[in-house]
Amino acid sequence: AGRVGFPVLVRPSYVLGGQNMRIVINDDELERQVLSIFKHLPDNRVLIDQFLERTKEAEIDAIYDGEDLHIMGIMEHIEPAGIHSGDSSAVLPTYSLSEQAIQTMCDHAHKIAQALNIRGLINIQFAIKEDQVYVIEANPRASRTTPFIAKAYQAPYLNIASRIMLGVNKLRDFDIVKKLDGYAIKIPVFSFEKFPGVDKRLGPEMKSTGEAIHFIKDLKDPYFRELDRNRSMYLYN
């Protein structure tokens, strides 16, 4: 933390749903968070990452066959980086990222899939600040956005990825056609009314219990305009 400077993101080295992840802003909070992690997860290790404030987040889902990479979709989050991806509304395809940032993300995705020797699905999350692209994490598996993208594009991605994982086919064996007229918005579903006393502020720990899909024809749609108008790049605003 002294090397990268506060705020920092403190988390267990392996975690699902952002459990026990916290953004801390000083030494006292850092000490409390580290002790809390070791108390609840004594066999884990602690990672301390620089936290980029007021930063956009986007993610790529892709299929890699050892030679070629197919970008299934790129989703841009409405909420800033620091909000768990499962709690953020997200738009497919992206709507405000520059072509330079998108190309950089795709280049990084190919290099990461190649370096990890992936066969099948991979999800990579990025933070984008002033067109500078940072890799948050790479998950060499199906993510919660995989079925969302398959549904939105009406493409049999799970079947394709399964056959590539088994070594039956290569990407070149498939004629993949994406069918989406407009945009698809991922909408998190919360059940706060069933959990009284839960902190409703969004952060790196996931709190949603599901998600829905909303299709729009263009960015003039009232639903999207309302989401975008209320967009804040600050946490806990």
Label each PLM-derived region with a short phrase.
Residues 4-7, 17-18, 24-237:
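ATP-dependent carboxylate activation and anion-phosphoryl transfer catalytic cores
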